[in-house]
């Protein structure tokens, strides 16, 4: 067996052994060891060995003490980890049935804006939320302790939308405005405005980072959807098929598809991974302008399996949803067929979001309510939170999930992303967020200039 010691280290070890054997009168063993290790009496005599007499014992005692300290430290570390798990925020409670959790009442109210809040976005790693307002500013909040971290100024008209994205340059915040521009803010450099993207000819109503890449999509009243490279700021692709204001866009979690919708009352699904965007379907059915859209996570597929065509594989944008001024929400399959219509709101549907567990769809409206629709019960409204705001509710977002690092047991925040466009039916339940823990936190913004934060609390007995 080859030694891991250098020749010098091996010689020093042999000298220590000789000194130990000599000091303890083990003459026969000493003679045998000298012969085996090639250390004759004239090379390392008793006088020289005296200098090494206690070296072996000291090293052994030192290593033993170090090992005891290491074991004690590991035990203390385990105790601290158990204490941390017992005191972690309720919204990270592993014992809670997070797939069935629904909001009950706001635990935080963030107030500082001087005009309507038009948009919100959660930071993918930290307990931060960005909000954009008609007061021309973007504000960054710590939603856990309700503190205003900073205010970003730069837009000259109302801020219409914000979104965080994890890019090769780090985490960026994108904002768009009625001033026709898009701004990129570097979150790692005090939110410095690093780029301003110009190319739209009218109000830019929505921005969304495309997962698994350095792309940003934007939608505008100029009837265009533009894809941008956020590293160099160049326009990559332009979609010009809409015949009215494009109000909202939503990418699939694998970055292969983009959903767009707006005032022309159409829903369009684009394959944006192609060299030129390919329209997979154009659907109609709403009776008024469409204000919002969302792509369902793969975790929703099993709850809507009876509505989907049976085939060997599916795409990441198998199910999509839209909300309209006609007060309804519609769900669509990947062919543009309406598979479900949800009615119950008394006014415009402003924003929608799928529960990460896939079972529910949440919506907010100008009727000041948040509604929760159970997709496993034909879209029945199972919960309605009245007067969630003191005015129209304009936006709704669910916090990104937490990816567990199984190598060391630590938790890190992760976007929902997947590399393949074609997904085997047997893998659908795994694809939504593989290895990702759902966080029971969501937020809404309204014309009352407030952000409401909803989260699972320790005393929540009922999830619905």
From Swiss-Prot:
SMART domains: LisH (SM00667), WD40 (SM00320). It holds the Pfam family LisH_PAC1. It is found in: Cytoplasm, Cytoskeleton; Cytoplasm, Cytoskeleton, Spindle pole. One of its GO terms (cellular component) is COPI vesicle coat. Residues 63-88 form a coiled coil. Keywords: Cell cycle, Cell division, Coiled coil, Cytoplasm, Cytoskeleton, Microtubule, Mitosis, Repeat, Transport, WD repeat. CDD domains: WD40. GO terms for molecular function: dynein complex binding. GO terms for biological process: cell division; endoplasmic reticulum to Golgi vesicle-mediated transport; establishment of mitotic spindle orientation; intra-Golgi vesicle-mediated transport; intracellular protein transport; microtubule sliding; retrograde vesicle-mediated transport, Golgi to endoplasmic reticulum. WD repeats lie at residues 112-151, 154-195, 199-238, 241-280, 285-343, 344-383, 388-424, 426-464. Residues 9-41 form the LisH domain. Positively regulates the activity of the minus-end directed microtubule motor protein dynein. May enhance dynein-mediated microtubule sliding by targeting dynein to the microtubule plus end. Required for nuclear migration during vegetative growth as well as development. Required for retrograde early endosome (EE) transport from the hyphal tip. Required for localization of dynein to the mitotic spindle poles. Recruits additional proteins to the dynein complex at SPBs. Belongs to the WD repeat LIS1/nudF family. Self-associates. Interacts with nudE and dynein. Dimerization mediated by the LisH domain may be required to activate dynein. HAMAP family: lis1 (MF_03141). This is Nuclear distribution protein nudF 2. It comes from Penicillium rubens (strain ATCC 28089 / DSM 1075 / NRRL 1951 / Wisconsin 54-1255).
